[in-house]
Swiss-Prot record:
Species this protein is from: Lysinibacillus sphaericus (strain C3-41)
Residues bound to Mg(2+): S101, D241, D243, D245
Protein family according to the UniProt entry: Belongs to the phosphohexose mutase family.
Any one Gene Ontology cellular component term annotated for this protein: cytosol
PTM characteristics: Activated by phosphorylation.
Keywords: Isomerase, Magnesium, Metal-binding, Phosphoprotein
Enzyme class: isomerase
Cofactor: Mg(2+)
This enzyme's EC code(s): 5.4.2.10
Protein name per UniProt: Phosphoglucosamine mutase
InterPro entries: A-D-PHexomutase_a/b/a-I, A-D-PHexomutase_a/b/a-I/II/III, A-D-PHexomutase_a/b/a-II, A-D-PHexomutase_a/b/a-III, A-D-PHexomutase_C, A-D-PHexomutase_C_sf, A-D-PHexomutase_CS, Alpha-D-phosphohexomutase_SF
Amino acid sequence: MGKYFGTDGVRGVANSELTPEFAFKLGRIGGYVLTKDATDRPKVLIGRDTRISGEMLEGALVAGLLSIGVEVMRLGIISTPGVAYLTRIMSADAGVMISASHNPVADNGIKFFGPDGFKLTDAQEEEIEVLLDAQEDTLPRPIGADLGSVSDYFEGGQKYIQYLKQTVDEEFDGIHVALDCAHGATSSLATHLFADLEADISTMGSSPNGLNINDGVGSTHPEGLAKFVLEKDADVGLAFDGDGDRLIAVDENGKIVDGDQIMFIIGKYLNAVGRLKKQTIVSTVMSNMGFYKAVEDNGMQSIQTAVGDRYVVEEMRANDYNLGGEQSGHIVFLDFNTTGDGLLTGIQLVNIMKATGKKLSELAAEMKIYPQRLVNVRVTDKHAVTENTKVAAVIAEVEAAMAGNGRVLVRPSGTEPLVRVMVEAATETACERFVERIADVVRAEMGLTD
């Protein structure tokens, strides 16, 4: 991670940390770095989620891109994976998504995609950061006919949906799907997609007003969907986040099915039909111990990466794997798209239910989940935790007490000013005790409370 770029682009409080002035500068510099080698008039696609600040930042970003001579196509409200897909198949020089994903409405972010639909390399981000910190703007300033132009391509979302439908073998008639769109980017896309696939649909979290994105709904609040599934007597619930790049599911009994379980279910099915490359699933260090055991017990392997879907994708690309993801619900199918995709994951999951004739509860029951607790501690310097001797000492103390029957992971968040404390243990009681013991020391040492 650099000065401006985190694990998922540039983020901050909109109009305070992430200002329109900065967005203009980022558009200008990002546009230059990503299109300077273009032989024709460069083209960049821009999408956004439903946050009130999206239009403000989009306007500034577009102005910056136009000032460097880029042809801009605005996609309107669309999911992050939708932007990645369209960037690739429309032969654009770059794509940009304006979103802070699952973060609160006050936050926003800007993430770039290269012409191949993948997120930027570290080298590209570093080049942009160097120019952002330059004392003087020496980039080209085209005039007249060489200035950029802007157009709208709002039908891009429908093009993306048509593509997704081609990735499944079954129609979903007879399956009642409850959708929670987090009042975000999938609010329209999800309903159209599942209706086209003949599912019976009930929806919540699909009335965005600019302020309600992720507010008690979506993949970070699946308990609301769990109640909704029971109320509507649905067969499955699918909760997306604000920008639609992650999915958390709920079974017909209202029980939450997380990203680890979803990865296992899909991995097992793909392996059975001969479509799981190298019989391997790529996950992160945050995956539950039960995931690793279930993968191994079913004749598959797992590879661990650092937390962040970009690291999962890097490992998948480097070693030719086609399935990976995170417990948080970022699931990547490299056969179909270049980034985590909630809608794609959702239809693959329902497709497996239809193909096997099994309920989601039956599919999920094949993986035992070990008790796990995650506590987020808000701090000013999240990286200082890695060098704190008292934090290191309490981690060692807890690990010794668990005697190999559990694990501890303490790390700085890649996108927020948080230290994440995760503990897995043999029992819920031990898990709770150990995670609070470590979190208390982190709070005391960092000098802040949640």
